[in-house]
């Protein structure tokens, strides 16, 4: 595991204690992903890859109550919050799944792929899925946190958000990984916050504040820079509050 991934794992491990209280976006996207999963087959074994604290497990157990479910996450504190009876928990990396070839009927992964190399995740899915098995995933697209990027214009030259794969890259990852795309659907979700600190806290408490970029800010922002950043963001305020966009993609593919 490289240094960036270790830092990301640490960020999500720290977020575990707050995660369920602020994971509104994960619950929303998970429900949308399940609704989009028009799959007639009944999977015997389901992997929740990047399961977090286990919200997806609830959706899976309702949809496929007879399935054997494996919950996998690389942050052990997340796994410790999952009731023991809900699934077999494995601490592991979705870019290097510790599972046997062709051992899974359906791989579910909601809002985890964006922290990884999408092509590698698809290759791992192709490896563990049985013939005819499904990858059902959601991920973030390049429009995510667009407001943060706009607010930092003229403040500094650091990169403050991650680079997320666009629809073309996602489609290529599926096809190159020998999976047949069945659904690729974009859903733009916007959340609103009363003030900037609560907006930033929501990102931090989800563990999504780690930026994997060479030119990311490594120290604290100065008071002058903060004031300019806050003023820029305030100009985006609507009647609902300060907006923050989650540009999401729902992906369903078959081996």
Question: Which residues does each predicted region cover?
Answer:
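A short SAM/SAH-binding and catalytic strip from SAM-dependent methyltransferases
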Residues: 105-119
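Class I SAM-dependent methyltransferase SAM/SAH-binding core
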Residues: 45-97
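N-terminal, positively charged/glycine-rich alpha-helical extensions of SAM-dependent methyltransferases
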Residues: 1-17
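A short glycine-rich, Lys/Arg-flanked "PGG" loop and its adjoining helix->strand segment in the class I
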Residues: 119-134
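A short acidic, Gly/Pro-enriched loop at the edge of an enzyme's catalytic core
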Residues: 95-107
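Conserved alpha-helix/loop element of class I SAM-dependent methyltransferases that forms part
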Residues: 24-43
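Conserved catalytic/acceptor-binding region of the Class I
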Residues: 134-198, 206-218
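Conserved Class I S-adenosyl-L-methionine
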Residues: 53-55, 183-255
């Amino acid at each position: 595991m490289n240094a960036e991934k270790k830092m990301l794992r640490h960020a999500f491990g720290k977020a575990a204690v707050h995660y369920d209280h602020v994971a509104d976006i994960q619950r929303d996207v998970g429900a949308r992903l399940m609704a989009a999963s028009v799959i007639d087959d009944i999977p015997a074994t389901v992997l929740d890859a990047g399961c977090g604290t286990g919200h997806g497990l609830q959706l899976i157990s309702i949809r496929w109550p007879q399935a054997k479910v494996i919950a996998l996450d690389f942050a052990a504190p997340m796994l410790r919050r999952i009731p023991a009876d809900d699934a077999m928990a494995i601490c592991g990396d979705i870019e290097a799944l510790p599972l046997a070839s062709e051992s899974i009927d359906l791989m579910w992964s909601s809002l985890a792929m964006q922290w990884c190399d999408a092509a590698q995740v698809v290759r791992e899915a192709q490896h563990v899925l049985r013939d005819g098995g499904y990858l059902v995933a959601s991920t973030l697209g390049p429009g995510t946190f667009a407001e943060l990027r706009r607010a930092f214009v003229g403040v500094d030259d650091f990169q403050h958000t991650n680079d997320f794969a666009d629809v073309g890259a996602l489609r290529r990852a599926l096809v190159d990984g020998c999976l047949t795309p069945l659904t690729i659907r974009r859903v733009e979700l916007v959340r609103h916050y009363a003030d900037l600190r609560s907006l930033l806290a929501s990102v931090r408490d989800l563990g999504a504040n780690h930026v994997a970029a060479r030119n990311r800010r490594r120290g604290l922002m100065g008071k002058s820079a903060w004031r300019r950043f806050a003023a820029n963001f305030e100009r985006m305020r609507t009647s609902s509050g300060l907006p923050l966009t989650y540009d999401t993609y729902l992906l369903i593919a078959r081996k």
